């Protein structure tokens, strides 16, 4: 009988907390009515939303399947083991840990497992497309470790493996990091492996951005080359916001596990782990592979449009001249617009992106001279060549002087109307 429970337990969110309910409605409307092109964002399937909002959120389960510190874990053990097995199968790994709450916590566990505080780590320079957790001085990785960096070539903006080798020979790092948050090309994992072996370093690959492309067989896998690989689940993989770790090295398994729990975290988020299991299952499907192919194709169409003569004439270009992955880095150094202004104009026409520094950027980090523009969410929404060509043209025109933002917004509205998002959820608040 429901009357044995307090009314606040059985009431809806709208009844208990109308302010937060309104925020959820407004955000649903924003996601429906804008074109989401932040490279690190995606839309999760309805099945993933169900798991994240499920009763598994009630269960505490410190430890690992079959080795918990709490009773009543027989069903969450099944969920976590499914996630582990599916991650291993998807990426051809011998080991997987699916407990990290985020990519950053996965990275912290990896570093603490393979390096001792004070030892040297070598990663891509943050200002050249690296990540905070790869050695930024204000991040744990830069505070606990002696972080040195390699960069990109000032002419090509590509990672120069000869320069990486020179830095490795100079600094003799204990860990070499291959991975990025804003780099539009594939990395040479075999070359990184050779350099790591030459200097006696562990090779850690952070594939957070391109894991979905790897799962679909559209990007080289780092797993055969790296000692350990970390990732998020919510970017190209299109799962819940969270992280995971995989490796072929079963000898590292105990150290990695102990550095996730109890080293970095306490109780795992079982509702999120169940959602990861579902995301990994979906990532093995043909539909997912098609989506990843459309993701890459969409980014390439955007790069082609932004390198056209009219875009270059207005001061817009693309770093490295194109892309191999799910994102494009627009270079605005010779544009009348800085990164902040360009982000604001695109928001006005209904496209959400983020300003991003370009290598050797003359502008401050909160302003920048670039945009990072990603295609995963639009591919998930169903966009193909026709729609991505239209989006690319809208962006190119929006970044030109005197853009007719009202007309461009109407073109965006036509696209969002043609590809409704989460039609089964509550109506848009917009």
From Swiss-Prot:
GO terms for molecular function: glycine hydroxymethyltransferase activity; pyridoxal phosphate binding. (6S)-5,6,7,8-tetrahydrofolate binds at residues 126, 130-132. Its cofactor is pyridoxal 5'-phosphate. Its EC number is 2.1.2.1. GO terms for biological process: glycine biosynthetic process from serine; tetrahydrofolate interconversion. Homodimer. One of its GO terms (cellular component) is cytosol. It is an enzyme of class 2 (transferase). The lineage of its organism: Bacteria, Bacillati, Actinomycetota, Actinomycetes, Micrococcales. Belongs to the SHMT family. PROSITE patterns: SHMT. It is found in: Cytoplasm. It catalyses: (6R)-5,10-methylene-5,6,7,8-tetrahydrofolate + glycine + H2O = (6S)-5,6,7,8-tetrahydrofolate + L-serine. Pfam families: SHMT. It comes from Leifsonia xyli subsp. xyli (strain CTCB07). Keywords: Amino-acid biosynthesis, Cytoplasm, One-carbon metabolism, Pyridoxal phosphate, Transferase. HAMAP family: SHMT. This is Serine hydroxymethyltransferase. The modification N6-(pyridoxal phosphate)lysine is found at residue 235. InterPro entries: PyrdxlP-dep_Trfase, PyrdxlP-dep_Trfase_major, PyrdxlP-dep_Trfase_small, Ser_HO-MeTrfase, Ser_HO-MeTrfase-like, Ser_HO-MeTrfase_PLP_BS, SHMT-like_dom. Pathway: One-carbon metabolism; tetrahydrofolate interconversion; Amino-acid biosynthesis; glycine biosynthesis; glycine from L-serine: step 1/1. The record marks 234 as: Plays an important role in substrate specificity.
